[in-house]
Curated annotation (Swiss-Prot):
Pyruvic acid (Ser): residues bearing it: S24
Origin species: Agrobacterium fabrum (strain C58 / ATCC 33970)
Top class in the EC scheme: lyase
Gene: panD
UniProt binding sites for substrate: T56, G72, A73, A74
Broad class of the protein's primary localization: cytoplasm
Cellular component, GO, one term: cytosol
Protein name: Aspartate 1-decarboxylase
Pfam family, one: Asp_decarbox
Any Gene Ontology biological process: alanine biosynthetic process
Length: 155
């Protein structure tokens, strides 16, 4: 068995840190649902600013809030405004790599979903386990402003 990425929130911005709350990370359930992260699931959190690496479990905050709040002892590792990578994992047999397709979400500084990606492993002529990233269409209800709306309004 090998440990693999199962789902990832990449570059989400910390919106709060609550030292006095019991441990966990509070996340917007809409982000978690899209990525496939479940409540009470253990996740690894990597702080892009400080390099801190911690592990805790997920609880859901308010839907649509775009929250990312470190609670309890985890609150000591991040500050509001820090960007973090939140990664869930699972153990699979090596041959099951071909059947996995982890969902990876990237974020804007305001925690809107920027990109929806899938990681894939396929056998190629180069190697038995080759890595690919697929870009998926963004959800219709995404609040991401890529500037195209402003361009249309001016034209």
């Amino acid at each position: 068995m090998i440990r693999i990425v199962r789902a990832e929130l990449h570059g989400i911005t910390v919106t709060g840190a609550d030292l006095d709350y019991h441990g966990s990370i509070t996340l917007d359930p809409e982000h978690c649902d899209l990525a496939g992260i479940r409540p009470l699931e253990f996740v690894d959190i990597w702080n892009k600013q400080s390099g801190a690496r911690i592990s805790t479990y997920v609880i859901f905050g308010e839907a649509g809030s775009k929250c990312c709040i470190l609670n309890g002892a985890a609150a000591r590792t991040c500050q509001r405004g820090d960007q973090v990578i939140i990664c869930s994992s699972s153990y699979v047999e090596e041959t099951a790599l071909y059947d996995t397709a982890p969902m990876v979400l990237t974020f804007t500084p305001k925690n809107d979903v920027k990109d929806v990606l899938r990681y894939r492993v396929k056998e190629t002529a180069r190697r038995p386990f080759d890595f690919f990233i697929e870009t998926l269409p963004r959800a219709e209800n995404s609040d991401v402003d890529d500037g195209s709306a402003a361009d249309r309004a001016i034209a």
